[in-house]
Structures are given as structure tokens and as C-alpha cells.
Amino acid sequence: THGGFMDSHILRKAAARLPAVADLAVLRFNFRGVTSPRGASDGAFGDGIEERHDLAAAMEFVAQRSLPEPWLLGWSFGTEVVLKWGLEHPIAGAILLSPLLHRASAADLVAWAGSGIPLVAIIPEFDDYLRPAEARERFAVVPDVQLVAVDGAKHLWVGEKLTRRV
């Protein structure tokens, strides 16, 4: 992500816990130009446009392994990539954690409205970029979106209690 990476506390813990508790496979990856504790990815930040290819490569990996019913999860900048490019892939649903709605357009949102693909947006009460009231307004064009406002939470989901909620 731009500003985050696959080894963040939320994504690392989800990847460790979900296979055991929900029988799910988890694939984490960094977008181009991101440095994390596991190293640096190739390329440079593409402002949500070039990252389309990173998502496509990840989905190709999923398809090659015949993993059933893939869901996308994006956090912060990752939500922009999911909203803009996720519908190009055979997915079962998408989860948006702390969505920004800076790069995703109204047209991107409208595309999800007619897709029949479940969309869940998890909105922190005290988010720095998009709070629950504004999220309800902005996502109104997607009637089937499941908006989940989380009391007391902030954009980065700091603390074990909030990490577990996510």
C-alpha cells in the first residue's frame, strides 16, 4: 500500500489467525514501490492506476492454485485499488477496511451497485479520512453495501481489542 504494507499488525494477524479459525487461505502482497520488513517490492507508486497490475498478478496466483471463492480485502489505499479494479476479477466479495474514497470515483462505486458481489465497508468512528456519516452518504449509490461503523476506532486500528474486531 502507499503508506502501509503487508506486514502491518492487522494484516499479519489476520493472515495468521484466519486459516485456523475459518479455514481460509490468505494471500498478502505489497503494491509496487512498497518497503516492508520482508523487503522492497519492485516499481514505483502508481497512484492507484498501476497497482491494477499488482492486483491482477495476485489474482492470477489465486487462479493458478484453484483457490475457491476469493474475496478481496483492502485497507486504506488498498480499498481504492479494490474499488477501482476489483470487478475485473472473478471474486466472491470485497471488504474495505478504513476506505479513503480519494481515488475511487462515483462511477467506480456505481459499478459495484449492479455487480451482485457483496461489498462490506468497515468504517472507524474516528477515522482521519472517512467517518461513518460521510461513508453512508458516499456509499448511498451502492444500495447493497454493508456498512459497519466501529465505535472508538481510528484509521490505523491500534490496540488488540480493535485488531480482534477487525
How would you describe each model-predicted region?
Residues 1-67:
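Serine-hydrolase catalytic machinery in alpha/beta-hydrolase-like enzymes
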Residues 115-116, 120-123, 127:
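Short beta-strand/loop motif that positions the catalytic acidic residue
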